[in-house]
Structures are given as C-alpha cells and as structure tokens.
Amino acid sequence: MRISTYSDLHLEFGSGWMLPPAVNGDVMILAGDIVTLSDYEPLDQILRKWRKPVLYVTGNHEYYTRRPMSEEDNRFKAWLKAKHPHVRLLLDEEVSIGGVNFFGGTMWTDFNRADLRAMETAGSQMNDYRLIYNPDETPFTPADSIALHKNFASRLLNWFGKNLSGPRVVISHNAPVINPNSKYRGGPLTPAFNSLDMVGIIETHQPVLWVYGHTHECDDQTIGQTRIISNQPVYPGLGGVECKDFDEAGLPVEVGV
C-alpha cells in the first residue's frame, strides 16, 4: 500500500494550495490543521480531486470556531458522509483498509505528565484555550487536554492488544516524540505539543508507521522498526512554505501487507 501524508496545510488562511497532479497513492492521510471547521470549502476542493480513501484526524485549528468540539465533530462527519464518503474521520478510532490497520485521533498533549509550569504558560498564551470549547460549552483547558490524551492512550493500547493481522499505522496531530533537531526542543511550551508516554508505547508495540503534524517542522526518523514522519508546509499562503523539507507529493510511504 502506498500512503501519501499531509498535515498543517492551514487552508483557512486562503493559500489556495491544491494537490499537485503527481500525487499518487492508495490512501491519503490528513493529520490535522487542514482547515477550520467553520468553512469546509477549501477542503472540499481538494477532496473532489482525490477519490481514493482518506483518513483524517483533527488538529487544534479545526476547532478554532468557539463552538463545542463535539458539535463540530458531528457536523463534519455529516458533511463528509453526504459529500465525501471516501473520507473517514478518526476520533480515537480504528479502521482497516486493504489489510493495513490504522488507529487515529488528535492525541491532545498530556503536558509531559502534567507539567504545571507548562500548563500555566500554555493556558495563558495559546489560542487553544481561548478559541476551543468543550461539549458543555466551557472553554477548553490544559486539564481537558490531559483527560483527552488519556482517552487516546487507553484506546491506542486496547488496539495494540487486539490480535490483528497486517501492519499497523498510527495517526495523530500532536507529536509522539520530539524531532532530535527541533528548534523547540527543551522550550517552555514543548510539553504543549509532545507527550513523553508515547515513546515507551512505540518502543513496546512497534507500529510500522506513525504520522503526525502540529510542530511546524517536517520529520522523518525511526524508533526501532517504527518510522515516524511529518509532512507539513505550514501557512503556505503567508510568506511561503515554512518547512523547507515539505514534499508536495505527500512524502509517499510504502507499507507492505
């Protein structure tokens, strides 16, 4: 199976970015921060040109609408079902396609096991905690992020515990591990997009591939037999492509069955 991957296209900023004709594969992964869920039109233009299976996980920017996340999820699923049934939205869920097993979700951060300083800094500085709302219409908080992270991790481990034939691929928006060359390594907000517990999970369970986004840095590294990649242009309409290693063709990966 040939998999093309993208994240952080940020089409909400009017970049007009479109899939290049050279993109070729069996499955496309969209690992979040593609659009804000108040306007589907930029995404619609891309999905009309790609009729093969798409696996989508939401990022934080999808929810910058000041409406409850659960409400946005339901509206988005209904829109996809009506207009693009070849797209599967994964909300801490699994799906198998062509013998390959996928698990995906946003994977909100656990703030490196509830680092209080990072939680306070993020809560006061990041748009997530002003623009995103919980199902009960209260503002999203770092504590809510930790609770959602625990749900992701629990379901992921349950999936790894299943007796499935075929390779396994994990999709998240937040990073499962810091890029060794990251300019953000050791920064005060690094725990706001990285969770320490995922490294041990990767080392133990060894999925063949983990695809993520969010960091505004491209990545291609391995932990044991697991390849970890991120292919993100980041704000392509605002002064060019931020990640110079961005592959317009989707950084295609072959996953054997």
Predicted regions and their residues:
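N-terminal active-site segment of His-dependent metallophosphoesterases
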Residues: M1-E72, N134
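Charged helix-capping and loop-helix junction motifs
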Residues: Q45, E71-R75, P188-L196
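Active-site-proximal loop/helix segment associated with metal-binding centers of metalloenzymes
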Residues: F103-V169, N174-R185
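Beta-strand-turn-beta hairpins that frame and shape the catalytic cleft
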Residues: M1-S4, E94-G104, T222-R227
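Binuclear metal-dependent phosphoesterase catalytic core
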Residues: S96, S182, P188-L209, H216-V257
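Active-site neighborhood of phospho(di)ester-bond hydrolases with catalytic His/Asp-centered motifs
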Residues: T5-S7, M28-D33, L55-N60, R88-D92, ...
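A basic- and aromatic-enriched beta-loop-alpha substructure that forms the phosphate/nucleotide-
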Residues: P53-N127
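Active-site environment of divalent metal-dependent phosphoester hydrolases
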Residues: H10-W17, V35-E41, H61-E71, E94-S96, ...
